[in-house]
Design a protein with these regions (language model features):
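ATPase/helicase motor core of nucleic-acid motors
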Residues: 112, 309, 353-359, 386-520, ...
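Conserved RecA-like helicase ATPase core segment
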Residues: 2-12, 20, 26, 64, ...
Length: 809
């Protein structure tokens, strides 16, 4: 590394760099981090293993660029999550005493590329046949479109729906949805993808996929909509087919920074290349050991392709600031078993100072119920040792599939321990919220058949069968539903007609005010109409309150940031007049009520509001954004709750204590449909990604890591004998504690298996596993032959903690 090529700060700058904790901001960095930050005169790739401070490096680099006179509007910073984007922005704000950071193009791939598409709406209209009010369909809307198509092309889907086998039908739908996403993320024509032997479309035929894809694309186009994958696809097609537009963004972006580069797919790689100017600088930060999203199209090879294309200088961050030395050593030993993995030298920051040995605990259990009991007991034990250090939010239970969560949820609920299942149900998927959004979509887009169908399905239940026939007829004649219902003829005593006319009158009255009012006004009117016309379900009021909070937050956020960049990098005040200092600009004052009737110079419109909602795609994003913007905890953020989540959902998070559960063969690595028919190369590639997944899980832990597995597990309707994962055998034994492992050798496992078979264990355990699913109240059958594994409600943690003798203390 040539130190003389590291740029030193310019003496002349209009930006003030804040001192943090009495130190210069660069003194907050390690020598490795500082070198990576100060390299700004060429492209670079930063290898940043788990816990090595990659977010800090990226944010300090942005601050360093601006401090060296780089225009904020010429910096593009791309992330994969809103959480990462918000964290980066808040850290840059801490570093720089200047308001111009709002000019930085910082956000997720989808939010930035959607902005580019919106700014080039004329091209989008001409080439993609979508007018300027085009909608973005989320996964739920995408599924609704596919439901209209699949019966025509997939016989088994139609059969499963007729048998009312919802799960089987849903699995088919999600499988097709995934194939469509992967096709779009390749940036190639559908025929080209399905003809590629390496592109898996099993169990479907090429013609099926081609016809479904084209039909789906046409239905989106007819509804003036695109899905999430289209945001990337259309950006790629626009930039690759229009040199003038591509040149505009090449001229604009001098520096491009990309977080989690190992997760990029083909189309993201190509878009970045299209907006990269010849002498521009790209900084990619990533870790090939954390590439775990191949099912979304991410390609670990992109790291190698980046090096070949841009000849970057490589920087390696080798110190883990998150985890103990045992966790770091164990994770490193594991990942070295991957053949196609870069070699690493990674150490813990506490390697020299750590006095107490804290090995990773391996715990085996009789079955998944016993596993859940042991995990929760250990959580209680750790919490009681130090309640301040170990609040409930410092614990995480990580699993490979969502199905594994149930026994832990039952146990936590019975023990009265607060918990949160992450990524289970999106706030935006709730029926009442889908309904409100559908009304808003219809207001700006009469072509949106899907939204109108949802409105009738959710609101007009009494006439759903009649409307289904009308809509089916409209589909065949390719008519818009809105036109159809406007032309309905009344019949004698027709309540249906009266309801529909009332609905049409309401929608038309709102349309007349679209240019005069902001989204929060329409949200309130829609809620009033729904309340007056239809019945509400229990819990809807709370959801509506949260939606109102979100509408208020997004509106105020918009008006607090009116001064923005245009695409040429120039500042543009969007108001009709210059009203600097006007009280219409709301300066992060969340508690100030918004008057929906107030006339503003600049209107936040429904289209922008819907874009913002769709890009806040998780409950955590919504809550975090509202609370961060307000400066208060307007909405409880579930911070003091035990977190249950898949390993995929845990990416980017950290916890004091992590329990990785169900670490058995068939789950680690995960078996999947058609795996036995795969080539050796594909099976090996799959196993390497599964190993990376296990690496990600281990490196979420800061202090304590527990790896658990069960000897028997309920799979479908059968109880299967299970063996611990081969990955456990790949860990560094020196740093493992096997005292909780009942059977820690293959020989003992075979003896255990034999004893179970001799005792006719399958019959004995049928009733043991017969506990019912539950909602709010636990309801399961006790096994007459065994003591109940789960404590009664009267033995909950809160109840016992009040007793003089608490057995868990």
């Amino acid at each position: 590394m040539n130190s003389d090529r590291i740029v030193t700060p310019k003496s002349e700058t209009n930006f003030t760099l804040n001192n943090l904790n009495g130190f210069s901001y660069l003194e907050q960095l390690s020598p490795e981090q500082k070198d990576a930050v100060k390299c700004i005169d060429r492209s670079q790739i930063i290898s940043a293993p788990a816990g090595s401070g990659k977010t800090r490096v990226l944010t300090y680099k942005i601050a360093y660029l601006i401090a060296n006179g780089v225009k904020p509007s010429s910096i593009l910073a791309l992330t994969f999550t809103n959480k990462a984007a918000n964290e980066m922005k808040s850290r840059v704000i801490e570093l720089l005493d200047n308001n111009s950071i709002n000019e930085i193009w910082m956000g997720t791939f989808h939010s930035i590329f959607l902005r580019i598409l919106r700014n080039n709406s004329e091209y989008v209209s001409t080439k993609f046949k979508l007018n300027q009010h085009f909608l973005i369909y989320d996964q739920k809307a995408k599924n609704a479109v596919l439901e209209l198509i699949l019966e025509k092309y997939i016989k088994t889907y139609k059969e499963e729906k007729q048998k009312d086998n919802r799960k089987a039908a849903q699995d088919i739908l999600l499988g097709i949805s995934n194939i469509i996403s992967r096709i779009k993320n390749e940036g190639k024509k559908v025929q080209e993808c399905v003809s590629d032997e390496s592109f898996d479309i099993r169990p479907y035929k090429k013609d099926q996929i081609i016809n479904i894809y084209k039909d789906y694309r046409n239905k989106l186009q007819n509804s003036n909509a695109m899905d999430f994958d289209d945001i990337l696809l259309y950006t790629f097609l626009m930039l690759s087919n229009n040199k003038e537009i591509a040149q505009k963004y090449q001229n604009l972006f001098e520096y491009i920074l990309i977080d989690e580069y190992q997760d990029t797919n083909s189309i993201q790689f190509n878009i970045i290349d299209l907006i990269h100017r010849k002498n521009g600088k790209i900084c990619a930060v990533g870790d090939d050991a954390q590439c775990i999203y191949s099912f979304r199209g991410s390609k670990i090879e992109n790291i190698q392709k980046f090096s070949e294309k841009y000849s970057p200088t490589e920087y390696k961050l080798s110190i883990n600031y998150r985890s103990t030395k045992e966790i770091v050593k164990v994770a490193n030993k594991l990942i070295l078993n991957n053949e196609h993995q870069s070699k690493r030298i990674e150490t813990s920051k506490d390697e020299q100072n750590q006095l107490i040995e804290n090995k990773i605990k391996i715990i085996s259990s009789e079955d998944e119920k016993d596993e859940a009991r042991k995990v929760i007991e250990k959580i209680i034990e750790l919490r009681n040792k130090d309640i301040i250090e170990n609040d409930w939010g410092s614990f995480a239970i990580l699993y490979r599939t969502h199905k594994q969560a149930e026994p832990f949820e039952i146990q936590l609920k019975n023990m009265d321990i607060p918990y949160k299942i992450m990524g289970k149900i999106s706030f935006l998927d709730n029926k009442i919220i889908v309904l409100i959004i559908s009304y808003l979509r219809l207001l700006i887009n009469e072509k949106d058949n899907i939204s109108l169908q949802k409105i009738f399905s959710f609101s007009f239940n009494c006439i759903s069968s009649k409307m289904k026939k009308i809509f089916d007829k409209a589909d065949k004649s390719q008519e818009y539903y809105w036109n159809v219902i406007n032309n309905l003829k009344p019949s004698k005593n027709d309540n249906t007609y009266i309801l529909i006319k009332k609905f049409i009158t309401f929608i038309n009255s709102l349309k007349e005010q679209i240019t005069m009012k902001e989204p929060i006004y329409f949200v309130e009117k829609i809620i009033e109409f729904i309340k007056s016309s239809f019945s509400f379900n229990e819990g809807d009021e709370d959801l509506i309150s949260l939606f109102n909070n979100m509408a208020e937050f997004l509106t105020q956020k918009y008006h607090s940031n009116l001064r923005i960049n245009d695409d040429d990098g120039s500042k543009e005040n969007k108001s009709k007049d210059n009203f600097e200092g006007s009280d219409l600009i709301l300066q992060n004052n969340f508690n100030e009520d918004i008057d929906p009737n107030k006339s503003l110079f600049v209107k936040y419109n429904i289209k922008e509001f819907l874009d913002d909602i769709i890009l806040l795609n998780t409950n955590e994003d919504i809550i975090e954004n509202i609370n961060n913007f307000s400066g208060n905890e307007i909405i409880p953020n579930n911070s003091n709750k035990v977190k249950l989540m898949t390993i995929h959902s845990s990416k980017g998070l950290e916890f004091n204590s992590v329990f990785i559960v169900g670490v058995e063969e068939h789950l680690y690595p995960l078996s999947y449909y058609g795996m036995k028919d795969e080539t050796e190369e594909k099976r090996k590639k799959h196993e390497e990604e599964e190993r990376r997944m296990f690496y990600v899980a281990i490196t979420r832990a800061k202090q304590n890591c527990f790896i658990t597995y069960a000897h028997k597990r309920l799979t479908g309707k059968n109880v299967m004998i299970r063996k611990k994962s081969k990955f456990i055998g790949e860990l560094e034994n020196k740093y493992l504690d096997f005292s909780g492992d009942i059977i820690n050798s293959n020989e003992n496992f075979l003896q255990f298996k034999k004893s179970l078979l001799n005792n006719n264990w399958n019959n004995n355990f049928n009733s043991f596993y017969n506990y019912k699913s539950y909602s709010h109240n636990i309801n399961y059958n006790k096994d007459k032959n065994k003591n109940e594994s789960f404590p009664k409600k009267s033995n909950s943690y809160n109840f016992l903690n009040k007793k003089r003798y608490n057995p868990f203390k």
